[in-house]
Each structure stands twice: as structure tokens, then as C-alpha cells.
Regions:
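Charged, long alpha-helical assembly modules
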Residues: 147-193
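Short, flexible beta-strand-to-coil junctions
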Residues: 17-23, 74-79, 136-138
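ADP-ribosyltransferase catalytic core
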Residues: 39-108
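ADP-ribose/NAD+-binding catalytic cleft of ART/PARP-like enzymes
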Residues: 2-50, 66, 186-193
Length: 193
């Protein structure tokens, strides 16, 4: 990890995905106001010890869409410490800060998820978990496109391993029709091997 002062470059949009206005850890966000982290240790190695607020950008948000059903634009207040997380699934696409403003709430749709897929620059190794994320959120068209574009006989074992790792947590395997469909399609590809 390294300390980074964020400046908007080339109209880069910073984004945060949240369930309505609460994080998955029950933090209640104030919309259009400065949110200040109760805990932030920029030198911590473990994300839980670091605290703060995570956010991403348009090029990497696809991987993190399972973190909520609404997407917000992120504004970084001037006196904010921001860390770019290099040791993660999307290096250069996950940031953590002690302060954040979330604004411009939009419900994430399958069409939006597909647009993020078309813009994404996540590494190939992050696509299996991105497939899991969009499947879990029931973005069927996006999931089917990732499956069609990315999964093949050469990488099917890796996709199934990552799928099982993600979906076996919290018994997500039967979460919705898209999860069931993609799971079945992955196993059909495996059978072709």
C-alpha cells in the first residue's frame, strides 16, 4: 500500500456501491455530507484494522458490485488521507480514506452493470469474482456476457474454484435464478473438457 493524493484525471469518476444508504457493516452514510471514519489507521496491513471507507472507480467497480444495490459518486474532501490499495483483486482500483462524501444515488441495474463491464480494466484474474458479483446481484445479461467472453476450457477450473469460494460463503448458491443459471453453465463448460 502507499499513500496517494487523489486528483481527478481524465474525468475519472470515483464510485461507491452501498445497500441503500448503509454499508454491509451497517455504517449509516450521510448523503451529500462529509462522512468521517470512526477508525482509520493508514499504516495497518489488514483492511479490518485500517478502517476508513472503501471506494473504486469506473474501470474497476464491476468487481465490487455485490457490495450494494445503489451506486454513488464519491467526492474526496480536501483534507482527506487516501490510500490506494495495491494488494487487492483490482490494483489501482480500490481506495480507502478517512473521509468521504457520497452523492448522486442511483439504483444499479443490469444495463448499468453491463456498461461497467464494457469499460472495465480489471485484471483477467479478477473476472471470476466479478462474474460471481454480478450473478449474486441478479444482473443476468452482464453475467452471461462475462461467461461468454471470458470462460473457456482452459480456465474453467479456476472459474469454478473462485465461484465455489465466493458462493459457498453465506450459502449464496441458490440466491437467485442468475446464480443457478451461471453455476449450471460453468458445469456444462467443465463437462466439455
Amino acid at each position: 500500500m502507499y499513500r496517494l493524493h487523489l486528483e481527478r484525471k481524465n474525468d475519472m469518476k470515483y464510485l461507491k456501491v452501498i445497500f441503500d444508504d448503509k454499508s454491509r457493516y451497517n455504517y449509516q452514510y450521510k448523503i451529500d455530507e462529509v462522512n468521517i471514519a470512526n477508525n482509520f489507521n493508514k499504516d495497518a496491513k489488514n483492511p479490518k484494522d485500517m478502517g476508513g471507507f472503501n471506494f473504486s472507480n469506473e474501470e474497476n467497480i464491476l468487481r465490487w458490485l455485490h457490495n450494494g444495490n445503489y451506486i454513488y459518486d464519491v467526492i474526496i474532501p480536501n483534507d482527506t488521507t487516501v490510500i490506494s490499495i495495491k494488494e487487492c483483486a483490482t490494483p489501482g482500483g480500490v481506495f480507502r480514506s478517512n473521509k468521504i462524501i457520497v452523492t448522486n444515488k442511483r439504483k444499479v441495474t443490469d444495463d448499468m452493470a453491463f456498461e461497467y463491464y464494457k469499460k472495465t480494466k480489471i485484471p483477467e484474474s479478477a473476472f471470476p469474482k466479478a462474474l460471481c458479483a454480478v450473478s449474486l446481484m441478479n444482473y443476468k445479461n452482464t453475467a452471461l456476457n462475462i461467461l461468454k467472453d471470458k470462460v473457456n476450457e482452459d480456465n474453467i477450473d479456476f472459474y469454478i474454484e473462485e465461484w465455489n469460494d465466493f458462493m459457498n460463503k453465506k450459502d449464496r448458491n441458490n440466491s437467485n435464478d442468475t446464480v443457478i443459471l451461471i453455476n449450471n453453465e460453468l458445469h456444462k463448460i467443465k463437462e466439455l473438457e
